[in-house]
Amino acid sequence: MAIERTLSIIKPDAVAKNVIGKIYQRFEDAGLKIIAAKMVHLSEQEAGQFYAVHKERPFYKDLVSFMTSGPVMIQCLEGENAIAKNRELMGATDPKKADAGTIRADFADSIDANAVHGSDAPETAAVEVAFFFPGMNVYSR
């Protein structure tokens, strides 16, 4: 099994609900280590750059607006198959379709305010981690 890194963002809706600790507990219970973390209030420019891959999609402006509506908690997770493990913990993008016990089923309000973001592949994980955490700010443990 491969040790991987993945980016996770606890979105403004979940931060506002004060469930950061509950979500962190799920990461740790699944064997994922938080090796970098910070709380930030993304600017429109930062959110726009991060989600640039969606720029031509109809939901892009709403996504950028939502991601800048309040603080987010950004973390780099590390562990065996971290990308797939985190995506399993998150559940389906639409919380109505998410399995019971997943982060989105338990904490998300809608397909837009869906509590968390997670990298979907090793290539995107590397780009996303580097976007928020230059190498000197990530510490394996």
Swiss-Prot record:
Q: What does this protein do?
A: Major role in the synthesis of nucleoside triphosphates other than ATP. The ATP gamma phosphate is transferred to the NDP beta phosphate via a ping-pong mechanism, using a phosphorylated active-site intermediate.
| HAMAP family assigned to the protein according to its UniProt record, in alphabetical order | NDP_kinase
Q: Which SMART domains match?
A: NDK
PROSITE patterns, from UniProt?
Answer: NDPK, NDPK_LIKE
Share what the entry says about its subunit structure, partners included.
Answer: Homotetramer.
Its EC number(s) = 2.7.4.6
Originating gene: ndk
Task: Tell me the protein's name.
Answer: Nucleoside diphosphate kinase
State the PANTHER family in the record: NUCLEOSIDE DIPHOSPHATE KINASE, NUCLEOSIDE DIPHOSPHATE KINASE DDB_G0292928-RELATED
Q: Which GO terms describe its biological process?
A: CTP biosynthetic process; GTP biosynthetic process; UTP biosynthetic process
Instruction: Output a single Gene Ontology CC term carried by this record.
Output: cytoplasm
Task: Give the organism the record lists.
Answer: Azoarcus sp. (strain BH72)
Q: Which Gene3D superfamilies match?
A: Nucleoside diphosphate kinase-like domain
Keywords for the protein's UniProt record, in alphabetical order: ATP-binding, Cytoplasm, Kinase, Magnesium, Metal-binding, Nucleotide metabolism, Nucleotide-binding, Phosphoprotein, Transferase
Q: State where ATP binds.
A: 11, 59, 87, 93, 104, 114
Per UniProt, subcellular location reads as:
Cytoplasm
Q: Which family does it belong to?
A: Belongs to the NDK family.
